[in-house]
Amino acid sequence: MVETTQHFVSIESSNRPDPANTTPANYSIQLPQRYRNIWSAMLVNIALPAVSPPQKYVYLDIDKLNSIDSTSPSGGVNFALAKIPLSIAGTGNVFFADTMTSSFPNVPLQNPVATMDKLNIKLKDANGNVLTIPAGNEHSFMIQLTCGDYIPRGGGSTITQNGRVLGGTR
């Protein structure tokens, strides 16, 4: 029987290690532990201030966890982890989304991530341009990581037509 573990990770953009040389819309942050054999990632919630230029949608891009494809000319495969609809573009209101409304599906990654100890985060528009969040307006969000069994000497998993199979070449 396959066992999975759910991890919920809270991220605050104000905790980025080098705020003087990064922005709240494009940064890297260390995770509290190394996560192994990540099968899926899902945005649980987000509090997001107004962005510049004003947008109807903001795309959350987290390197290695993206599973949403885009049809925009500069989009492509694995463009974003989540598409976040902003209720009123350009307002100073904080937008909060919650997956209890099934806004953000939990989509399995085509190729599970063997290990991850850092997140590379970008907030983008539909064309892939990194947005601007005014100085001092930080954001906060939570993601859920679903991790499979950690198997020494051959962990990882593979998605086949009949489901997910433990083991593999990683």
Curated annotation (Swiss-Prot):
| Description of what induces expression | Expressed in the late phase of the viral replicative cycle.
Per UniProt, the keywords (alphabetical) are: Capsid protein, Glycoprotein, Late protein, Virion
Where found, per UniProt?
A: Virion
Q: Origin, by domain of life?
A: Viruses
* Listed GO CC annotations: viral capsid
Region annotated Disordered sits at 1-25
Which residues are sugar-modified?
A: 21, 93, 129, 137
What does the entry's PTM section describe? Glycosylated. The pattern of glycosylation sites are unusual.
Whether Glycoprotein counts among this entry's keywords is: yes
**Annotated function:** Constitutes the 12 pentameric capsomers positioned at the 5-fold vertices of the outer capsid shell. One of the vertex is composed of a variant of P1 (type II pentameric capsomer) and has thereby a structure slightly different from the other verteces (type I pentameric capsomers).
Q: What is this protein called?
A: Penton capsid protein P1
Q: Which organism is it from?
A: Paramecium bursaria Chlorella virus 1
Q: Which gene encodes it?
A: A310L
